[in-house]
């Protein structure tokens, strides 16, 4: 998964 500022979402 891709994570930015503790928010993760599918890549």
Curated annotation (Swiss-Prot):
Main location: secreted
Highest taxon in the source lineage: Eukaryota
Entry's Gene Ontology cellular component terms: extracellular region
Expression by tissue: Expressed by the venom duct.
Keyword Metal-binding: no
Position of the signal peptide: none
Keywords for the protein's UniProt record, in alphabetical order: Disulfide bond, Secreted, Toxin
Disulfide topology: 2-11, 3-8
Subcellular location: Secreted
Keyword Lipoprotein found: no
GO molecular function, one term: toxin activity
Domain remark text: The cysteine framework is X (CC-C-C).
Family that this chain belongs to: Belongs to the conotoxin T superfamily.
Protein name: Conotoxin ar5c
Organism lineage: Eukaryota, Metazoa, Spiralia, Lophotrochozoa, Mollusca
């Amino acid at each position: 998964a891709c994570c930015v500022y503790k928010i993760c979402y599918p890549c």
